[in-house]
Curated annotation (Swiss-Prot):
GO annotation terms (biological process): methylation; tRNA processing
A Gene Ontology term for the protein's cellular component: tRNA (m2G10) methyltransferase complex
Name of this chain's protein: tRNA (guanine(10)-N(2))-methyltransferase TRMT11
Enzyme category, top tier: transferase
Keyword Protein transport: no
Subunit (UniProt): Part of the heterodimeric TRMT11-TRM112 methyltransferase complex; this complex forms an active tRNA methyltransferase, where TRMT112 acts as an activator of the catalytic subunit TRMT11.
Modified residues (N-acetylalanine): 2
Subcellular location: Cytoplasm
Superkingdom as given in the UniProt entry: Eukaryota
PROSITE patterns assigned to the protein according to its UniProt record, in alphabetical order: N6_MTASE (PS00092), SAM_MT_TRM11 (PS51627)
């Protein structure tokens, strides 16, 4: 606990959305900006109030310039489980740390924030008046104050059982707000070019933050689709590149996915999406390519690989190959004329993730991150099913439920070891290999569950 004694304490007000993704995002961003995650709290769970120890206010501000999981951050001056405990805590806070924000030439206002309860205006004023013992010497300015102070009260998580008194009360100086507005400004609904599986804007930014994407990075998406993940990375100043096996998607051709629109327009493509947000300068290129047969020379090119592989549900899992599928087929492929159109074959999920991890291990710089979605059949899921590679360390594993029996997990891995040729076969010796192959039947299990649910609904309506 020595860390919390030497560092300033801050209060994070978290959004109550994507709860499992919040802690890995904050840890990744603190690491990115040179901070170390430290807290006096034993658990965070679903609570929106987190007390953190952060080295400096600059790091706290940088954190809020990136996070979409946190709403605001405050310099914590005091907290307690009752008003009396709060006031006692405030009286013990060093006066020399308060004075720069309370002097006579300053302006301020005090806000009351409650979680899971609404207070009347009279109750709010009563709480503000109770803070008169603090040495405020400045003038109140409700419109444009220099400093904003907040009283935050936590009434628990159960909306059906709201206590009379709060569980915890906090008081602090507001530092900055997070980037929650990006979720709306980059909404897929407003985007020029979209597809059936375009990634939600909020999740795209979370993935970029988990991947520690930063300015001047080179970020690659091997299953780029309509480029939603590239947009989030480009927003943070990274140069983006992608590939996809679907010619029509890469070139913006074919049928449109929007309602009341039959065909895609001539300017519906990934580059146009980046142009829409003023990010075209970060566009490197997007190519038609097969992820199972990378066309890259050996070397480390990418600072991060951020991707959402197809699961075989709304987008098919495909790769190029020969109908005969014999080892010599690769040699024949190399001799084929340029006009040859390759056969499209099914791409097993276990093979897809094996190829993805090998590719990441070979092309990521040391310390670079791989962030991808792993679909799972919930009743059979175990941690052993998460793909493993000797060059990659698992950083986080977060679940997003899709249905009662399926979910997808956001896997973040970091390259910690230089790639060697023998590493691409290490999975065969791992205890994880057999459970890992269970991903191949995800599509069948998914639709099996859908069929059972439809039959159950039809039966209930008939009754």
């Amino acid at each position: 606990m020595a860390l919390s004694c030497t560092l300033n304490r801050y209060l994070l007000l978290m959004a109550q959305e994507h709860l499992e993704f919040r802690l890995p995002e904050i840890k990744s961003l603190l690491s990115l900006f040179g901070g170390q995650f430290g807290s006096s709290q034993e658990t965070f769970g679903k609570s929106p109030f987190w007390i953190l120890s952060i080295p400096s206010e600059d790091i706290a501000r940088n954190l809020m310039k990136r996070t979409v999981c946190a709403k605001s951050i405050f310099e914590l001056w005091g907290h307690g489980q009752s008003p009396e405990e709060l006031y006692s805590s405030l009286k013990n806070y060093p006066v020399e740390k308060m004075v720069p924000f309370l002097h006579s030439d300053s302006t301020y206002k005090i806000k009351i924030h409650t979680f899971n309860k609404t207070l009347t205006q009279e109750e709010k004023i009563k709480r503000i008046d109770a803070l008169e013992f603090l040495p405020f010497e400045g003038k109140v300015n409700l419109k444009k104050p220099q400093h904003v102070f907040s009283v935050l009260e936590d009434y628990g998580l159960d909306p059906n059982c709201i206590p009379e008194n709060p569980h915890n009360i906090y008081f602090g100086r507001w530092i900055a707000d997070g980037q929650r507005e990006l979720i709306e400004s980059y909404s897929v609904k407003k985007r020029h070019f979209i597809g059936n599986t375009s990634m939600d804007a909020g999740l795209s930014f979370i993935m970029a933050n988990h991947g520690k994407v930063k300015e001047n990075d080179i970020v690659f998406d091997p299953f780029v689709g309509t480029g939603g993940l590239l947009i989030a990375c480009a927003h943070f100043g990274a140069y983006v590149y992608g590939t996809d096996i679907d010619y029509n998607t890469v070139h913006g051709l074919g049928k449109a996915t929007r309602k009341n629109q039959k065909w895609r327009g001539p300017d519906e493509n990934i580059r146009a999406n980046l142009r829409q947000y003023g990010l075209e300068k970060y566009y490197l290129d997007v190519l038609v390519s097969d992820a199972s047969k990378p066309s890259w020379r050996k070397g480390t090119y990418f600072d991060a690989i951020i991707t959402d592989p197809p699961y075989g549900i709304r987008e098919s899992t495909r790769r190029t190959g020969s109908q005969k599928e014999i080892p010599k087929g690769i040699e024949k492929w190399e001799k084929c004329p340029e006009s040859h159109v390759p056969v499209s074959l099914s791409y097993h999920l276990s093979d897809m993730f094996l190829d993805l991890l090998n590719f990441a291990a070979e092309t990521l710089v040391l310390g670079g991150r791989l962030v991808y979605w792993l679909p799972v059949y919930t009743p059979e899921y175990t941690e052993e099913m998460v793909p493993w590679h000797p060059c990659l360390e698992l950083i986080s594993n977060c679940e997003q439920k899709l249905s009662s029996h399926t979910s997808r997990r956001l896997i973040t891995m970091e390259k910690v070891k230089k790639f060697e040729n023998r590493d691409q076969y290490s999975h065969l010796l791992s205890d994880h290999f057999l459970p890992y192959q269970g991903h191949n039947s995800f599509r069948e299990k998914y639709f099996s569950g859908v069929t059972k649910r439809i039959a159950k609904e039809e039966k209930s309506t008939q009754e």
